[in-house]
A protein has these predicted regions:
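Acyl-CoA/ACP chain-elongation machinery
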Residues: 62-108, 141-155, 183-192, 209-259
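Stable alpha-helical structural segments in soluble proteins, enriched in small hydrophobic residues
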Residues: 50, 163-171, 202, 234
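Short beta-strand-to-turn element immediately C-terminal to the catalytic PLP-Schiff-base lysine
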Residues: 119-123, 169, 191, 200, ...
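Condensing-enzyme catalytic core mediating Claisen C-C bond formation in acyl metabolism
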Residues: 94-171, 180, 294
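Conserved catalytic cysteine-centered active-site region
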Residues: 1-4, 13-53, 62, 85-111, ...
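Flexible, low-complexity linker/loop segments at domain and module junctions
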Residues: 171-177, 208, 256-294
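Glycine-/small-residue-rich "gating" segment that lines the acyl/pantetheine channel
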Residues: 4-11, 52, 56, 74-129, ...
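Conserved small-residue
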Residues: 27, 47, 54, 83, ...
Length: 294
């Protein structure tokens, strides 16, 4: 019976249910790609890590292009209960649209979301040769794990600082060159505090003048998909020269003295930006995204 099911190709539906790598496998099968279909899980840093793997493979000459996909569909009663037991979710959800309050003094947790994002990452020469519209350039990546706690960041912020610093070094840019930071910005009391520490350490006296915003305030936290989704936000910020706001920022936190682009989108000159993704388990990925060079 098993052989008959395989012969009839009816096994695919079951395969997709129990194989964690099935998303990458199905995409490879659909598009006929020849590179290795890799699925990875580094919690909320997964999407950023996928982009990093693509960048490194292209730099090594192993690939001309890669399809980087971040996707998550974790909203379920069990997941809500588990995150609630961690005190990670916002409980102030009336009205629901005001529940996510990254960087605000009255923040109390994140809002779960489902979503997906996809980026075609390829060498600039390849993109130009086929006449592709180039939204931006992945200029550098940095990653660092702090191995401190399953759900908490190390209070010294060293891994976050190292992640951002490595990304800047990889992109051959100084902190002064960065025009915008797309924050991980979950809205949990501890995460936002640690990200603020990292940004202020890396950017020094200029940190207060670097716009930093969290699109999670508008769309919620897409978990494993967040790195790719937020890289897309960052690319569009560069393409349109417009910064997405951090909405629901009605009670500023004196302990986070940053320009969080409160409540209203803003036109701005953006040549170079950083996108941060920090995951449970201590995985941290930062990506530097730049405008296409002339």
């Amino acid at each position: 019976m098993r052989c008959c099911a395989l012969r009839a190709r009816s096994f695919a539906a079951y395969h997709r249910r129990f194989m964690s790598a099935s998303v990458a496998d199905r995409l490879a099968d659909t598009f006929g790609t020849k590179g290795s279909p890799i699925s990875l899980q580094t919690a909320c840093a997964s999407g950023g890590a996928a982009i990093q793997l693509a960048l490194e493979a292209i730099r090594r000459g192993e690939a001309e292009a890669a399809l980087c996909v971040g996707t998550d569909g974790s909203v379920s009663p069990e997941a809500v209960v588990r995150f609630s037991l961690l005190s990670a979710l916002s409980t102030r959800n009336e009205p629901p649209a005001g529940a996510a309050r990254p960087f605000a003094k009255d923040r109390d947790g994140f809002v779960m979301a489902e979503g997906a994002g996809a980026l075609v990452v390829e060498s600039l020469a390849s993109a130009r040769a086929r006449g592709a519209r180039v939204l931006g350039v992945i200029a550098g990546c940095g990653e660092k794990a702090d191995s401190f706690h399953l759900t908490r960041s190390s209070p010294d912020g060293k891994a976050i600082i190292a992640s951002i610093s490595q990304a800047l070094s990889d992109a051959a840019l100084e902190p002064d060159a960065i025009d915008y930071v797309n924050a991980h910005g979950t809205g949990t009391p501890e995460n936002d505090k640690m990200e603020c520490l990292g940004v202020m350490t890396v950017f020094g006296a200029r940190a207060r003048d670097v716009p930093i915003s969290s699109n999670k305030s508008m769309i919620g936290h897409t978990l494993s998909a967040a790195g790719v989704v937020e890289a897309a936000f960052t690319l569009l910020s560069i393409a349109h020269q417009r910064l997405p706001p951090t909405i629901n920022h009605n009670v500023p936190d004196p302990a986070i003295p940053l320009d969080v682009v409160p409540n209203v989108a803003r036109d701005a000159r953006v040549r170079h930006a950083v996108s941060n993704s920090f995951g449970f388990g201590g995985q941290n990925v930062s990506i530097v995204i730049s405008a296409e060079p002339a």
